[in-house]
């Protein structure tokens, strides 16, 4: 939780640089980055920093009337990391969309391979640097750049990827 909160703080502390990178990368007006996109990305990390301290496993008594052989049935939910998440993001709002995939996965303890859109990777690379500065351990976040039909497809087909979080075009599928 502390690392996620720190990432949010570092995003805020670097708002001008990140807004400029969004403008250079995507053409977004500086003002939009400064008043909406960059603060929104910081808030994603803070929201999940708060949430990850509240996630718990639980046992829920069953409300099923018929119990085979007279046994009581309980449902058990186990909150644990799913493993490696491949997060593939589009070009149109790079930093906030990267944050919306990265923060929840880190919150629940997953490692992430972040593949930003090939046209807008500057803020993703800088976000990776800020994550390291915040104390995220090496190897928890890996950023790979390249074309979707090459890198994205390789991630989607890789046996070491346990979950794919994808936002993109209908052309991709």
Roles of regions detected by a PLM:
Residues 56-173:
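Rossmann-like NAD(P) dinucleotide-binding subdomain of oxidoreductase/dehydrogenase enzymes
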Residues 2-98, 102:
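N-terminal Rossmann NAD(P)-binding subdomain characteristic of aldehyde/semialdehyde dehydrogenases
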């Amino acid at each position: 939780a502390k690392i996620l909160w720190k990432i949010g703080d570092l995003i805020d502390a670097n708002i001008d640089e990140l807004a400029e990178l969004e403008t250079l990368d995507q053409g977004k007006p500086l003002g939009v980055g400064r008043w909406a996109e960059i603060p929104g990305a910081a808030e994603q990390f803070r929201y999940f920093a708060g949430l990850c301290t509240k996630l718990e496993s639980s046992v829920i008594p069953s409300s099923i009337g018929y119990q085979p052989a007279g046994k009581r049935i309980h449902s058990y939910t186990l909150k644990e990391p799913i493993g490696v998440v491949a997060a593939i993001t589009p070009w149109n709002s790079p930093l906030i969309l990267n944050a919306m995939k990265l923060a929840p996965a880190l919150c629940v303890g997953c490692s992430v391979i972040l593949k930003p859109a090939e046209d807008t990777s500057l803020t993703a690379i800088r976000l990776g640097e800020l994550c390291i500065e915040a104390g995220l351990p090496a190897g928890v976040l890996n950023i790979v750049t390249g074309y979707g039909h090459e890198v994205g497809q390789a991630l989607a087909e890789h046996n070491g990827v346990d979950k794919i979080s994808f936002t993109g075009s209908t052309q991709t599928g």
